From Swiss-Prot:
Molecular function terms from GO: signaling receptor activity; steroid binding
Residue ranges that the UniProt entry lists as topological domain Extracellular: 73-83, 135-147, 239-258, 314-344
Primary subcellular site in the record, as a coarse category: membrane
Similarity comment: family membership: Belongs to the ADIPOR family.
Native source organism of the sequence: Homo sapiens (Human)
Biological function: Plasma membrane progesterone (P4) receptor coupled to G proteins. Seems to act through a G(s) mediated pathway. Involved in neurosteroid inhibition of apoptosis. May be involved in regulating rapid P4 signaling in the nervous system. Also binds dehydroepiandrosterone (DHEA), pregnanolone, pregnenolone and allopregnanolone.
Complex formation: Homodimer.
Protein name: Membrane progestin receptor delta
Cell compartments where the protein resides: Cell membrane
Recorded name of the encoding gene: PAQR6
Transmembrane segments: 52-72, 84-104, 114-134, 148-168, 218-238, 259-279, 293-313
Length: 344
């Protein structure tokens, strides 16, 4: 009879440095786990379990929203809706890629890096996906058909390449320069977010203090919730609070990466609601403007960006595979001090 045994968990001093997490002292899986061990570990309480499920379940929520909207009467046949549908594709992809990365990252040091390369690529595509509905529905009136509007989506595609490249490169610096690694990775994701949300920041500044007299430039409440969740997400990612203040207390539940996941998916939910609000409230006004990028152009841009990001990931993966097994990136040294784990 087939017998499945849950994998044994380890303390931080029992795993190579490449697997350490800041402030997480226990609940580590074996760094040579099989794929089956990794899947089984998602059903036992490890320091990754909540990370896995907080992105696995939202994947199905966003997929349900995509199918529900796409299956609506006449929704797919209306070109006005296409940017929203294309946005929802990477909105489904990024939590799924994150879930897979957290599930299979304990198979080996090389596999850990490759898993997160793919995770970063999916996040980069999500940053591009955000640009489609913002360009179609959320641009300020004074920006329509200007240079920024015309190049908004192509610039977002280039930003996705920069995001993937910097974030993947940051993993090569983790052990020798953890501070620089964290700065590069945080900047890699903060910059596309700031660029994508330029239309919202401008509309917010334009309407500040004007109450209800802002017309089509007014932001919905969902926009505010989205921006707040994004700010909180960035803070949690950069600070590693609360586990940094009490190492070992939040190993299984309540550490920053779990809270980061929850805030990220809540932010995406509110972003979707905000886009739907802009679609509805600005439709009559946008109908008088020139049509946005068609479905073929929208999908082609996303596909080309996905191909470019995969090439970047392939280049970093090839570099990783050529590295000797003895290099610090793949091994790390013994625990020094026993109180701090490295930053992810």
């Amino acid at each position: 009879m087939l017998s499945l045994k849950l994998p044994q968990l380890l303390q931080v001093h029992q795993v190579p440095r490449v697997f350490w997490e800041d402030g997480i002292m226990s609940g580590y899986r074996r760094p040579t786990s099989s794929a089956l061990d990794c899947v089984l570990s998602s059903f036992q309480m490890t320091n990754e379990t909540v990370n896995i499920w907080t992105h696995f379940l939202p994947t199905w929520y966003f997929l349900w929203r995509l199918l529900a909207l796409a299956g609506g009467p006449g929704f797919r046949a209306e070109p006005y809706h296409w940017p929203l549908l294309v946005f929802l594709l990477p909105a489904c992809l990024y939590p799924f890629a994150s879930c897979c990365a957290h599930t299979f990252s304990s198979m080996s040091p090389r596999m850990r890096h490759i898993c997160y390369f793919l995770d970063y690529g999916a996040l980069s595509l999500y940053s591009l996906g955000c640009a489609f509905p913002y360009a179609a529905y959320s641009m300020p009136a004074s920006w329509l058909h200007g240079h920024l509007h015309q190049f908004f989506v192509p610039a977002a595609a280039l930003n996705s390449f920069l995001c993937t490249g910097l974030s993947c490169y940051s993993r090569f610096l983790e052990l020798e320069s953890p501070g620089l690694s964290k700065v590069l990775r945080t900047g890699a994701f903060a910059y596309p977010f700031l660029f994508d949300n330029l239309p919202l920041f401008y509309r917010l500044g334009l309407c500040w203090g004007r109450g209800h007299g802002c017309g089509q430039e007014a932001l919905s409440t969902s926009h505010g919730y989205h921006l707040f969740c994004a700010l909180l997400t960035g803070f949690l990612f950069a600070s590693h609070l609360p586990e940094r203040l009490a190492p070992g207390r939040f190993d299984y539940i309540g550490h920053s990466h779990q809270l980061f996941h929850i805030c990220a998916v809540l932010g995406t939910h509110f972003q979707l609601e905000a886009v739907l609000a802009d679609m509805g409230s600005r439709r009559a006004w946008l109908a008088t403007q020139e049509p946005a990028l068609g479905l073929a152009g929208t999908v082609a841009t996303l596909v080309l960006a996905a191909a470019g990001n995969l090439l970047i990931i392939a280049a970093f993966t090839a570099t990783l595979l050529r590295a000797p097994s003895t290099c610090p990136l793949l091994q790390g040294g013994p625990l020094e001090g026993g109180t701090q784990a490295k930053q992810q």
